[in-house]
């Protein structure tokens, strides 16, 4: 549907009003989480775009604290699943257990039945457990016995991977990684931020409490409104050019990338770039998408969707280098 300039102006005003809770949310979580603004914003983008986020970072970077604080600020149910090699699918989604008193099988729901789920070290569990979680993420429902149970909304899975430890891990296949809207690399805090973290943890035994500052209804309305954000055809073509340049680099004067890319982004990459760009616009209180929204989220959306050749590894070329080259060459509308 084509929007007039007046329609876009009205939508912009509406989003400026409806997105006011973002500032409250950031301020409240900042009382507990020092730094990590990029991670929090990416979680909010995942939440607004109805996607899930894969985080990669060493232990101790406040991944658990961030998603737990976010759930408390929204008064949502939080669940943490520690993935281990002996975990079973039933430990994640639940199972049917026999009740001797009632002489019947009853449902025991697993930790997947929550609004915010931290799937900690997802690459430590066998493939069948990963598959059970990812299927629930995709379908947003779980089948136990003969019955199907819808998962609660909002529903956000934050899966973590440790980039350092490879022994005893089951790497997520590319097809499974593709189900996450973003893969976010978590970095260390700055020296100043870490100084505040030290003081906060040394001076008090009790961590600050996060209060509810946003209602579930506001989140639901924000998700619906995010879908309505205007995206011009020029921005759509910009997204398509970025993704197509990862598939056919030679058509975009990027011949040097052809021997380095094993496979480019799938159509899901284009869809998720558009969804994440709209959510990024919402966070910036805009009713329309600009190219900078696309550029800001492109690495997080694309880094787990591109495959590199052995030649790229031999030349020390990583996915970020490829994306940088693509963004540099593709003309900004």
Where are these regions (language model features)?
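C-terminal engagement/docking regions of AAA+ P-loop ATPases
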Residues: 1-15, 249-333
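Pre-Walker A (pre-P-loop) alpha-helix and adjacent loop at the N terminus of AAA/AAA+ ATPase modules
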Residues: 15-61, 244
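Walker A/P-loop
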Residues: 47-84
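P-loop (Walker A) phosphate-binding loop of NTP-binding proteins
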Residues: 58, 92, 160
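Short glycine-rich substrate-engagement loop in P-loop NTPases that contacts/grips substrate
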Residues: 87-116
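Conserved AAA+ ATPase core "coupling" helix
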Residues: 89, 93, 169-224, 232-242
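AAA+/SF3 P-loop NTPase mechanochemical coupling elements
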Residues: 106-115, 144-161, 172-182
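Conserved AAA+/SF3 P-loop NTPase catalytic/coupling segment centered on the Walker-B
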Residues: 111-138, 152, 167-176, 188-196
């Amino acid at each position: 549907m084509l929007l007039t300039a007046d329609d876009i102006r009205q939508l912009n005003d509406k989003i400026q009003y409806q997105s006011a809770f973002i500032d409250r949310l950031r301020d409240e979580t900042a009382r507990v989480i020092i730094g990590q603004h990029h991670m929090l914003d990416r979680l909010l983008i995942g939440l607004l775009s109805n996607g899930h986020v894969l985080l990669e970072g060493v232990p101790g970077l406040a991944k658990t604290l961030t998603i737990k604080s976010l759930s408390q600020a929204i008064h949502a149910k939080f669940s943490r699943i520690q993935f281990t090699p002996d975990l079973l699918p039933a430990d994640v989604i639940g199972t049917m257990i026999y009740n001797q008193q009632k002489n019947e099988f009853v449902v025991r729901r697993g930790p997947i039945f929550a609004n915010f789920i931290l799937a900690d070290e997802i690459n430590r569990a066998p493939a069948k457990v990963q598959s059970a979680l990812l299927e629930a993420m995709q379908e947003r429902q779980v089948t136990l016995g003969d019955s199907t149970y819808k998962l609660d909304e909002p529903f956000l899975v934050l899966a973590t991977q440790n980039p350092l430890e490879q022994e005893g891990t089951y790497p997520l296949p590319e097809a499974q990684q593709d189900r996450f809207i973003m893969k976010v690399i978590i970095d260390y805090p700055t020296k100043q931020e870490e100084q505040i973290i030290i003081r906060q943890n040394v001076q008090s035994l009790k961590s600050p409490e996060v209060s509810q500052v946003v209602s579930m209804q506001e989140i639901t309305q924000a998700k619906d409104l995010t879908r309505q954000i205007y995206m011009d055809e020029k921005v759509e073509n910009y997204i398509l050019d970025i993704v197509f340049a990862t598939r056919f680099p030679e058509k975009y004067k990027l011949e040097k990338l052809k021997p380095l890319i094993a496979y480019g982004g799938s159509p899901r990459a284009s869809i998720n770039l558009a969804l994440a760009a709209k959510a990024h616009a919402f966070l910036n209180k805009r009713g329309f998408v600009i190219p900078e929204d696309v550029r800001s989220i492109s690495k997080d959306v694309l880094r787990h969707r591109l495959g590199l050749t052995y030649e790229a590894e031999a030349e020390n070329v990583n996915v970020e280098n490829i994306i940088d080259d693509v963004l540099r060459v593709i003309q900004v509308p």
